[in-house]
Amino acid sequence: MGPPSQLLTLARKAATAQSLDPALVCSVVEQESAWNPWAMRYEPAFFTKYVAPLYTNNKVSATEAYARGFSWGLMQVMGQVAREAGFEALFLSALCDPEQGLTIGCKVLRKKFDALAGDPTRALLAWNGGANPTYAAQVLARRSHYL
């Protein structure tokens, strides 16, 4: 059983809007959330490195800080990364809305491609934060499922 057709349509639309390969974006979604729009995961190392200093310096509330330490939605966009990319919804849980999550996720992924001369392997490793050296190969192996 594959992903719901409406999610595939939204993923392809968001990818195209950012001049990304729709099959690659669908592969990222499969890898990150298995097409579960409500997927979320707390990333303690990310929180400690990137978010805790904001909270410690009273730049954000405790609730907002902890939400920024989670990855959200279909593309598992980190809350902090979404805010840095201009995501303005009151609550970061709005990233679980497929259209909003895919839109901001593709915007962030496009920035990774632009920063890394369009190299898919390097852009995917940057997307994943570099913690998993096999991440890019795993995503690229799934790409053919969405052609």
Locate each region found by the language model.
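Catalytic glycan-binding domains that act on GlcNAc-containing polysaccharides
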Residues: 1-147
